């Protein structure tokens, strides 16, 4: 089986590349990074990516799209750029698949941001979508494009709604933010009340979930929650990080809500479990691994 990973130099993409390589899959990476040369890597233009050449030249069984923008604040500042990277780019990939490799399975990394503030917890895949940002809207639109290409062109597609991803190599979001503030601030201030909650999933569990999707999903344009079905408050995980980081500084919450941030998330992962998913990395183990990685930098 030959897998093309678009965005192979990003956080999830790099982990997925290494994971499938370790299992002796034939893996081809694709990204905009210019200072890397390898026989299994294709550099694409950051401003005008052309996927037709790739799919015309290579026989691909599975295309995993890990590319795109992943910042709610930046999507608010520059919505067209976010749309181009998260929606238009998906259409361009699928159009190339339709033209040259119509039997190729296509997986797109979507986001729990499509849900916004859900009406009930846990969140099922058929919940009403209330995205709170251009980022969430553009991810939702990309999901519709996957449905379009399956319905009208019989392309095998599947959208993965990633919840709160974390793990070694991620230099942004909550745990990296905490690390930077522990280094540079006397008092640690975080947005919100601390009662906001997320469903965290370690990147190692994300890539094993992707593998299960490749093996067992229907690929009929469906969406699948990628999470652990566990709800943790930001206060509790920040304190867990604090404890494991062995730092005496105090954490306070400023009660300010960042635009585009949801309040509470917990996923229903019945669909993912039916594919064979079992969590391997607990939040405690994952945070300790992250701290070990930070300390080795």
Regions found by a protein language model. Give the residues of each.
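Rossmann-fold cofactor-recognition segment
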Residues: 36-48
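NAD(P)H-binding glycine-rich loop region in Rossmannoid oxidoreductase-like domains
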Residues: 50-85
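Catalytic helix-loop patch of NAD(P)-dependent Rossmann-fold dehydrogenases
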Residues: 77-92, 114-159, 170-171
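Glycine/proline-rich active-site loop of Rossmann-fold NAD(P)-dependent oxidoreductases
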Residues: 140, 155-156, 165-177, 186, ...
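Conserved C-terminal active-site "lid" loop/helix of NAD(P)H-dependent oxidoreductases
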Residues: 203, 257-285, 289
């Amino acid at each position: 089986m030959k897998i093309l990973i678009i965005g192979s130099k990003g956080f999830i993409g790099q982990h997925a590349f290494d994971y499938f390589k370790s299992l002796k899959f034939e893996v081809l990476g694709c990204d905009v990074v210019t200072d890397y040369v390898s026989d299994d890597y294709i550099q694409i233009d950051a401003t005008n990516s052309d996927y037709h050449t790739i799919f015309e030249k290579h026989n691909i069984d599975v295309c995993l799209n890990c590319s795109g923008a992943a910042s709610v604040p930046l999507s608010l500042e520059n919505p067209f750029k976010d749309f181009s990277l998260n929606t238009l780019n998906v259409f361009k990939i699928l159009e190339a698949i339709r033209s040259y490799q119509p039997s190729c399975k296509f997986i797109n990394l979507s986001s729990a941001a499509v849900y916004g503030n859900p009406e009930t917890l846990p969140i099922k895949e058929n919940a009403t979508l209330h995205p709170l940002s251009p980022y969430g809207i553009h991810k939702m639109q990309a999901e519709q494009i996957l449905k379009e290409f399956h319905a009208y062109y019989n392309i095998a597609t599947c959208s993965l709604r990633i919840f709160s991803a974390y793990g070694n190599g991620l230099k942004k979001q909550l745990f990296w933010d905490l690390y930077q503030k522990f280094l540079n601030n006397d008092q640690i201030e975080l947005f919100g009340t601390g009662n906001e909650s997320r469903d965290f999933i370690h990147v190692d569990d994300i890539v094993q979930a992707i593998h299960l999707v490749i093996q067992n999903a229907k690929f009929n344009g469906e969406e699948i929650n990628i999470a652990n079905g566990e709800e943790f408050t930001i206060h509790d995980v920040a304190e867990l990080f604090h404890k494991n980081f062995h730092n005496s500084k105090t954490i306070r919450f400023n009660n300010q809500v960042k635009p585009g941030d949801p309040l509470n998330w917990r996923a229903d992962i019945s669909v993912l479990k039916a594919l064979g998913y079992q969590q391997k990395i607990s939040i405690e183990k994952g945070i300790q691994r992250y701290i070990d990685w930070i300390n080795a930098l």
